[in-house]
């Protein structure tokens, strides 16, 4: 390899890793001028700034739901900015990680990070390499995977912007039914799947609120027969619960029926629904860009 080619490799490695010239040169010399091996060398020796970005908050990114003939999964891959989440390198990484997760068994997230690709690189290492290349912290935040049987109807839905993904597992039914439920859950994000999942305290609170409303707004409510009052209260309670309980909600694709009735009409029972949305529960970092620029200027002036 000519000296010019070596210098070009050093320049490229510096751009990727943001490591000093001397460290890039040494990394390449110890890696037979292979860029990927050199990045690994920098990471192992703590010279790459990719590892130093590990304390940053990654709250943007993409989610993806996938399935094969036996398993279904949904996972979230995070970056620091929405801009990077739209980067083709990030999208390619997400697809690769999805394939690895679907093809391999694991018991938890830590176990999943150890899964290796055909070149022997773990998912954790792939993310470190991508962090060095892209310039932002990249993390596999969470993943849900389960196996299913032929008696179950399983479908996945990932919204076109990659911000919401849902998997639905039904006993009976068919793929179209499962797909419609997945799309419904993606759009409405119900807090509970079944009415029985709602905590008793919350149910009691709603019941008291509805009873007061019934006496105040339903004409001659107190004079109606007991069975009529019970029916009115149940309808009012279910209507309020339908704001956050899946089975009581009007189906997004056909508001004439509730999800519960839609499933019953198609001989289907809801067994599992999992919905991931990018950044759920993450406290996003507030960045003062003006202060950041001023700090960089001050550091530059000290050199």
Swiss-Prot record:
Keywords: Cytoplasm, Elongation factor, Protein biosynthesis. Signal peptide: none annotated. Residues 81-84 are annotated as: Involved in Mg(2+) ion dislocation from EF-Tu. The keyword Protein biosynthesis applies. It is found in: Cytoplasm. GO terms for cellular component: cytoplasm. It comes from the Bacteria. One of its GO terms (molecular function) is translation elongation factor activity. Pfam families: EF_TS (PF00889). InterPro entries: EF-Ts_dimer_sf, Transl_elong_EFTs/EF1B, Transl_elong_EFTs/EF1B_dimer, Transl_elong_Ts_CS, UBA-like_sf. Associates with the EF-Tu.GDP complex and induces the exchange of GDP to GTP. It remains bound to the aminoacyl-tRNA.EF-Tu.GTP complex up to the GTP hydrolysis stage on the ribosome. Belongs to the EF-Ts family. This is Elongation factor Ts. It comes from Mesomycoplasma hyopneumoniae (strain 232).
